Amino acid sequence: MKKRFLGVFIALLAVLGVCAQPVLKKVQVHLVPDHADAIYRLGEEAKFKVIALDCGLKLNDIQVNYEVSEDLMPARTKKSMTLRGNEGTIVAGTMKQPGFLRVKAVVEHEGSKYTSYSTVGFEPDKLTPMVKMPEDFDTYWADTKKLLDKVELAPKMDLIADRCTDKVDVYHISFGNIKGTRMYGVLTLPKKEGKYPAILKVPGAGVHAMSGNVAWAAKGAIVLEIGIHGIPVILENQLYSDLSRGVLSNYVLHGIENRDSYFFRRVYLGCVQAIDFLLSLPKNNGKVGVIGGSQGGMLSLATSYLDKRITATGVYFPAFCDQEAYLYGRTGGWPHFFKNKDNGKKEYVETARYYDGANFARKLTAPVYYAYGYNDLTCGPTTSAATYNVISAPKQVVIGGNEGHWLFPEHINGMWEWMIQELSK
């Protein structure tokens, strides 16, 4: 296993997939852990150096309101301090169990409030998921995949001429799925004759249009970005907004009362169909991988488990991982359904286990490139680390100490470059 920790503290302005890197603010409060790698032993005290800047210059004698909490859990401490000059120290305390401790600092200057976060790990390599593995997990999914035996792929490809370039053709595509539904996506295909690896890009949460990945297709990969809602993905944005507020509102919980009716059953099988589609393309070299973040991270884990033809798996800050952990007093995965203990009905919990990303991670065989950040307030590092730790396939991880629910360009580009290289062997 290769592990690289990049403690970068200056944000670059960039947009990465569906996750936007935050814009640099006028006032910054840097919270710097006293361990260079932000890793501590259980029982060891974590301290943070506080540095306040205004337009990059010292911001002296300002009051800092701060709180300390375990990852995505209620604050254990709320205090205030006044910096001496533009610096100070926060003693955050320790943890008795593996996990992550976070400091949130807020300053008010010239009528505006500015918030910063910094997170450290306490023996995070010892974290493991708390979600239970159903005894018939493998049997259930093997039987469920048999539903595809009766489904005709029946692919359709329509050229989107105004999106094509001198190097890449762009198509709006669709293919068959269970119950008479279809999956839709945007395919980017290198124009030059030859054989290319194929990559399935699975989406983050939401209902939205897709444009296709021309950049990586131009570098020598067939890329298919798919939607999961069974509707075309090149329509007007207003339509997707209306659907997200209407029939697809809170879709991640549709049918959760039963494993056979849950929303993602059709989606997972559609991802397997997408692999069939990619391998059917004449320009494919016979190799296919899958990549995705957040909801897409969960879909990447699930698809790699369900289809062993996949030989490379890219996952960043996966959602739907270790969701059950909330029921045992630890932070669980997005969408945080079980954070409300009233939602912990037996049938809901049992269904979620069959779809939990951590359970798929336990059974992966294809090589995995994994990435997440300690400051992720959507898919917390606790669930990302626990899920990574149970992967037994060949794996490597990139951790961004100050990354949230986004990745630096160097990290996401590194994942794509690794995948193309892996699929070109």
Label the model's feature ranges.
Residues 34-38, 148-193:
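N-terminal cap/lid segment of alpha/beta-hydrolase-fold proteins
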Residues 364, 370-372:
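Short beta-strand/loop motif that positions the catalytic acidic residue
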Residues 378, 385-425:
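C-terminal catalytic histidine-bearing segment of alpha/beta-hydrolase fold enzymes
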Residues 297-345, 399, 407-410:
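Hydrolase active-site cap/lid region
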Residues 185-189, 195-206:
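Short beta-strand element of the alpha/beta-hydrolase
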Residues 282-293:
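Alpha/beta-hydrolase fold nucleophile elbow
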Residues 208-269, 325-333:
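Cap/lid segment of the alpha/beta-hydrolase catalytic domain
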Residues 21-29:
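Proline/serine/threonine-rich low-complexity linkers at boundaries of modular beta-sandwich domains
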